[in-house]
Amino acid sequence: MKKAYVKSYGCQMNAYDAGRMADVLAAEGYSATESVEEADVVVLNTCHIREKAAEKVYSELGRLRVLKGERAESGQDTRIVVAGCVAQAEGREILSRAPAVDVVVGPQSYHRLPDLLRQSRETRVVDTEFPVEDKFDHLPARRNRGVTGFLTVQEGCDKFCAFCVVPYTRGAEVSRSVAAVVEEARRLVEGGVREITLIGQNVNAYHGDGPDGAPATLGHLMDALSAVPGLLRLRYTTSHPNDFADDLIAAHAGNPLVMPYLHLPVQSGSDRILHAMNRRHTGDAYRRLIERIRTARPDIALSSDFIVGFPGESDADFAETMRLVAEIGFAAAFSFKYSPRAGTPAAEREDAVPEAVKTERLAALQQLLDQQRHAFNAAAVGTVAEILVEKTGRHPGQVAGKTPHLQAVQFDAPASTIGTLVPVRITRAGSNSLFGEVLEGAAAAA
């Protein structure tokens, strides 16, 4: 049987797309392999958000060129595919920089991958079009891969933040219908998935057709998904502060399947930098939104993204970011040094922050965020949380899962608990995960 190796870089959307590409190849008779050395087709599903991520891809392609040559010497053919956002952004340039690549395919065209592979027998192929037809209408049934699963409900972004390539690589905002999303969710749950994370570049801008033909909101969509038998948990990512509607806040307060965890990027605490980033909100507007959300769901865990060293960022601007973080408090966060991306407005600016200053600011911000994360985890010790068991643990007799607040937990319990909710008393907090013990009688009941 032919074998396919699919590697994904970057965001949850890429992870979803990588899984769907594996499904497309499986429908063509390819079995999945974890060994790139034995793969007949190698797919790199790429990320273009930061320069470092893109360069990782080219480094990997250099290694694959050697592997392809070695396999050819033994009479084995290898097709190399570059998919995702680097493919969309750089197109034919990839063929020039990486001679071993056979197919370049964008994130809206990968449903055509089998045809592109066949064409590549004659000539190298690039397909980065935004097709008129919806790719989701052409994808095969999903193959389930665990207790949790991603489900794309929205793609693209219309915000055009000054630093971001997503509007150029993923296109304008489009949403799937409520019926299509619910049907995919139903199939996932029938296959064993118990927690679904709804994903989109700007997921709370969701506006898919509802049952009556009118646009539905993300809150309405989650209400519809809550009726899927067997579904235990719902999450969603990533959101923009400007699209956070009242019905979504109400879903956190009133829908028991919606978990008390929210990833809501702010990027900076400085109004001057937020304006330069074209974020369309202020630091105080973000604070007021968080206050409303916490009023509706006091136990919610907050996560965010931060960029340090955006062009023109002064010491005073960075101090505003530190002040916002200190005032709000985050359970988790992702912070990065600004990386210019070709074609974005920010890349044209000439007031770059020195690399040494970026590094210093990132270290200071990360130290504060780490302190907040450790404090949040430590506060869980002594409490009881319902853990959705996802897999076996690192040690014999151990399983692992997550709290409603997305904290990883390890504890002793039989493998039969996988896919169930188990009440666990948290006994210890590590640097990146929690440890606990099952309440007496709970594991046996599960």
UniProtKB/Swiss-Prot annotation:
Top EC category: transferase
SUPFAM superfamilies documented for this protein: Radical SAM enzymes
SMART domains: Elp3
Catalytic activity, reaction form: N(6)-dimethylallyladenosine(37) in tRNA + (sulfur carrier)-SH + AH2 + 2 S-adenosyl-L-methionine = 2-methylsulfanyl-N(6)-dimethylallyladenosine(37) in tRNA + (sulfur carrier)-H + 5'-deoxyadenosine + L-methionine + A + S-adenosyl-L-homocysteine + 2 H(+)
Domain MTTase N-terminal span(s) in chain numbering: 2-122
UniProt-annotated location(s): Cytoplasm
GO CC terms, sorted: cytosol
Alphabetized Pfam families for the sequence: Radical_SAM (PF04055), TRAM (PF01938), UPF0004 (PF00919)
InterPro entries associated with the record: Elp3/MiaA/NifB-like_rSAM (IPR006638), Methylthiotransferase (IPR005839), Methylthiotransferase_CS (IPR020612), Methylthiotransferase_N (IPR013848), Methylthiotransferase_N_sf (IPR038135), MiaB_methiolase (IPR006463), rSAM (IPR007197), rSAM_horseshoe (IPR023404)
Gene3D superfamilies, A to Z: Methylthiotransferase, N-terminal domain (3.40.50.12160), tm_1862 like domain (3.80.30.20)
Binding sites annotated in the UniProt record for [4Fe-4S] cluster 2: C157, C161, C164
Entry GO MF terms: 4 iron, 4 sulfur cluster binding; metal ion binding; N6-isopentenyladenosine methylthiotransferase activity
Binding residues for [4Fe-4S] cluster 1: C11, C47, C85
The enzyme's E.C. designation: 2.8.4.3
TRAM domain residues: 378-440
Signal peptide, first to last residue: none
Cofactor note: Binds 2 [4Fe-4S] clusters. One cluster is coordinated with 3 cysteines and an exchangeable S-adenosyl-L-methionine.
Keywords: 4Fe-4S, Cytoplasm, Iron, Iron-sulfur, Metal-binding, S-adenosyl-L-methionine, Transferase, tRNA processing
PROSITE patterns: MTTASE_N (PS51449), MTTASE_RADICAL (PS01278), RADICAL_SAM (PS51918), TRAM (PS50926)
Cofactor(s) the record lists: [4Fe-4S] cluster
Domain Radical SAM core: 143-375
Family: Belongs to the methylthiotransferase family. MiaB subfamily.
Role, per record: Catalyzes the methylthiolation of N6-(dimethylallyl)adenosine (i(6)A), leading to the formation of 2-methylthio-N6-(dimethylallyl)adenosine (ms(2)i(6)A) at position 37 in tRNAs that read codons beginning with uridine.
Subunit structure: Monomer.
This protein's name: tRNA-2-methylthio-N(6)-dimethylallyladenosine synthase
